[in-house]
Amino acid sequence: MPKLNCHHFEQNRCNSCQWLHKSYTEQLAEKTSDLKRLVSPYLLQSTEFLPAVTSPLAHFRNKAKMVVTGSVERPILGILNDDGTGTDLTDCPLYPQAFTPLFPILKTFIGRAGLVPYNVAKKRGELKYILITQSQHNQSLMIRFVLRSELKRPLVERELPMLLAQLPEKSVVSLNIQPQHSAILEGEQEIFLTEQQVLEERFNQIPLFIRPQGFFQTNPTVASQLYHTAQEWIKERPITQLWDLFCGVGGFGLHCANTLQTNNPNVALTGIEISASAIASATKSAQQLGLQNVKFASLDSAQFALNEQGTTPDLVIVNPPRRGIGKPLAEFINQLGSPYLIYSSCNAETMAKDFASLSHYELKKVQLFDMFPHTAHYEVLTFLVNKII
């Protein structure tokens, strides 16, 4: 398979994609070998190690995080160099092609609204970042201007109609206030400038809602296959109750419950996530799908599991952050005794450590999903079955 050509990488201006010097075939081979090495202690003769799910080489990202440098008349959108200057990355080949005409529109808007780029060395200026996300479902955009203060809000609101006239319908525009002089991407305060406050995405006919500051997969092509695969793995299993821990906006749980409820309307889903805004998104999705017996709650996943002693779901889904689920939750899952476990991970190293603690389970399926081409990172989906079944 070919390599992706990027002049920023070739000229050493941007090294975010550390593996651009490798062909895509090499990248996949290295990732597959890394995953095999990590899970090898848990591979049985009956374990299916499935072929990797590949990504498009370019235009696969649904979001851009642009540091704003330069001047208000000539803003630079891209990354910040060590010397404080900026590199323009508006032609980055990872972004959707719809972003190409958007960047000049945003540069004009910056000038008209007087959003002086923040100068780190001088601690002056207002505009720190522009964060952009696109919905593949309806091409609507979420554009977030990260500002030092609300000083320029009146000017932004004055120029907003001209910006909105050039954006797709159902787009979201907001100001995020980040007053600290530090490399923090966003602050806690979000000011919506549009009535629309969420982007609707759809994977496999399942509506999912993206909110500012919420986590959402950055590679929609691969993410939709990830959720669909989980759905396929469990659809014929005798499952009437499932828990989706670390559920985020509900991607895994909603896909699984939706397919299971077509055969059995009594299937019940409980989704747990510490982020209240993600839970609001998941609840909205369940309502739109018309799913019954679905409950999402904003709690710490480990704490929820420990509180629910005495209840045993047929399926537990875990999709933890990079640190993994940890020993206490793994031991609780052992004691819980659910027949089936789906573990999705963005860090196979911590997942493998968790497998050592999940001693009541054996590994039935493993599949690599190349969510992050041109880097060493990947997503992995696994299916485990209780040994007593």
Curated annotation (Swiss-Prot):
SUPFAM superfamilies membership: S-adenosyl-L-methionine-dependent methyltransferases
Molecular function via GO: 4 iron, 4 sulfur cluster binding; iron ion binding; rRNA (uridine-C5-)-methyltransferase activity
Family that this chain belongs to: Belongs to the class I-like SAM-binding methyltransferase superfamily. RNA M5U methyltransferase family. RlmC subfamily.
The EC number(s) this enzyme carries: 2.1.1.189
First-tier enzyme category under EC: transferase
Keywords, alphabetical: 4Fe-4S, Iron, Iron-sulfur, Metal-binding, Methyltransferase, rRNA processing, S-adenosyl-L-methionine, Transferase
Reaction(s) the record says it catalyses: uridine(747) in 23S rRNA + S-adenosyl-L-methionine = 5-methyluridine(747) in 23S rRNA + S-adenosyl-L-homocysteine + H(+)
Lineage: Bacteria, Pseudomonadati, Pseudomonadota, Gammaproteobacteria, Pasteurellales
PROSITE patterns: SAM_MT_RNA_M5U (PS51687), TRMA_1 (PS01230), TRMA_2 (PS01231)
Binding residue positions for S-adenosyl-L-methionine: 217, 246, 273, 319
Residues reported to bind [4Fe-4S] cluster: 6, 14, 17, 92
Protein name as it appears in the record: 23S rRNA (uracil(747)-C(5))-methyltransferase RlmC
Domain of life, source organism: Bacteria
Record NCBIfam families: meth_trns_rumB (TIGR02085)
CDD domains in the cross-refs: AdoMet_MTases
InterPro entries: 23SrRNA_MeTrfase_RlmC (IPR011825), MeTrfase_TrmA_AS (IPR030390), MeTrfase_TrmA_CS (IPR030391), SAM-dependent_MTases_sf (IPR029063), U5_MeTrfase_fam (IPR010280)
Residue positions of the active site: 346 (nucleophile)
GO biological process per UniProt: rRNA base methylation
Stated role: Catalyzes the formation of 5-methyl-uridine at position 747 (m5U747) in 23S rRNA.
